[in-house]
Amino acid sequence: MEVILEHLLHRAHELYQEDASSFELHSQLLLPFLDGSFTLEEYLKLDDGVLGTYFTQWSESADPILNDLAKRFLNRKPLKSATFSGNRDSKLVQELTLLVEKVGYNPVYYTAVNSSYDLPYDFYRPEQGRHRTQIEILRNDGTLIELSQVSQLVAALAGQEQGDERFFFPKEMVDPSLRDHYDLFDETYQEFASHIRNGALIEIN
């Protein structure tokens, strides 16, 4: 849902730049965020209830993108995603983005690329520029020992990046039951779906 939320707020920001008055009537607590001038106090005023109220109002907006993204967020309908290799599949991602646009979705708001690589745990390595504070265990004699030295599981994971790269797109691209104009773009949908297998992007030779 994070991608939908990010794109929803992005669309609101764009519309706010065009006509601030439309948001001043019903989204007062979000105004500082839409113009990029919020304070900590204003941030703390936001909660799920406030955002839910505003998003419900946006779901009735005359703007089709704001309207649709708000409904997707409220109804918990996230964009679907598939893993890919950035080095190998960058061209394929561009091609699939064009197919999403071809069937009528604005790719700015209905596609995304996200990398979630991270280190679950790493021990202190002063020779590396990117190191983390290690976890140490206090032993009975008062000495400290680094966590990976007493845990085989942590030792196996230490220093290993976990995560993947994902391409996000509307679920309608691969689920015929969700489409309004399946016949009109049948070949485009089929071409897109042919590049998705087992949750990953694939090249078709």
Residue ranges and their predicted role:
Residues 1-205:
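Histidine-centered, transition-metal-coordinating active-site segments
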